[in-house]
Amino acid sequence: MYWEEDNQDNISKTNDSIVDVSFKVNCKKIAADHSYDLFEAVLKKFPQIKEIENLAIHSVYGAESGAGWERPETEIYLSKRTRFCIRTPKEHSKDFFSLKNEILKVGEYEMQLSKPTIKDLIVTDTLFCRSVVVENSNNEEEFLKNVHSSLKSMGVNVKKMLCGKEHLIKIPKKTLVGKT
């Protein structure tokens, strides 16, 4: 854990040039390691994403446990409230409306997208990341030092960090190590 006290209030402002395009999804379950398959599915329906800078395709999130139940490691069960999000420059946001009602083939699963909504980014003092790719198997302290250094170089002042679970991300010809 990385911890630094700060009693100063910093006023932050959001950059309104980036937005989230958010879709409700109709899909009962999806592979736990679906990130690359999801990217490929979006690329197939919307090849222009290769040309868009500052674009992020977020993986789909499902609960890990609840009411005594724990999620299997291979699949994520999705609720009716599950959303799929593409973070994009505002000038490209309306382009993604072409994905309305499309069915994405994500690995062996099919995921139907609803009509999207555009959501502005909000200012927050908490940054949560489901997956940070790690170049080598750093111990937690080394990993947090590297993350702190990277964020500082981008002008992000970090006061507290907590490392989560390590997981594998499979892409063609390679397996990456990620940490939350």
In which residue ranges do the predicted regions lie?
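RNA-interacting cores
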Residues: 1-180
